[in-house]
Amino acid sequence: MTGYEIAKHAKVTPEKVRAYTESVDFSHLSAAERAAAIQKLAAMLNALSLEERQSLRQDRTAYKWFEKMTEDEKGEFLEATMPTGFKQMIGAFEDMPPDKRKKVVDQAIKQMKDQREKMAASGQLPSPGTNAVVLSQELQDKVTKIGLQSFYSHSSAQTKAELAPFLEEMQRTMESGRMLRQPRQP
């Protein structure tokens, strides 16, 4: 077998993640087996691109086990699968003044709504419970005022999982820099 063939078989794909989650009966594993299975799933997810992870979230593949996990397992899974970029993004968000935080939150929510509308128009509405805008106006105001780190650190594992699409959109918004650039003076 050549190096290319070995690499091809070793490369994690969304299909391999689907096959893994379907092949393991998570609810019948011992605590040690569950921990090992969660770590393997986390490693597989971390090897995927952002777009591949989002496709698995849309069809709920990556999170089929989530409802069966204990709160501690959920926390460990989320910590293991949170990209380093998220942690950096949360830190950068914390350093922003409240007016810029509000712009980022508003833009991320607008992008998510626009994406849902495009999917609905093309007949590709995602599964229920995926990619929905999860922040009420009250929560948007709270995130803007106290910062994402404080909000996120006090949230339950379930809330953190529900926030993942929003955080991804915020990260994309902040990375693009569109909302953070100062308007040009004439």
Which residues fall in each region the model found?
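Residues that form generic nucleotide/phosphate-binding pockets
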Residues: 44, 80, 92, 166-169, ...
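Residue-level signal for the start and early helices of compact helical domains
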Residues: 3, 8-11, 87, 142, ...
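Non-cytosolic head/periplasmic domains of membrane-anchored proteins
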Residues: 60-152
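A generic secondary-structure boundary signal that marks alpha-helix termini
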Residues: 50, 113-117, 172, 179
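Extracytoplasmic/luminal low-complexity segments enriched in Pro/Gly and acidic/polar residues
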Residues: 157-186
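Immediate post-signal-peptide N-terminus of mature secreted/exported proteins
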Residues: 3-76, 180-184
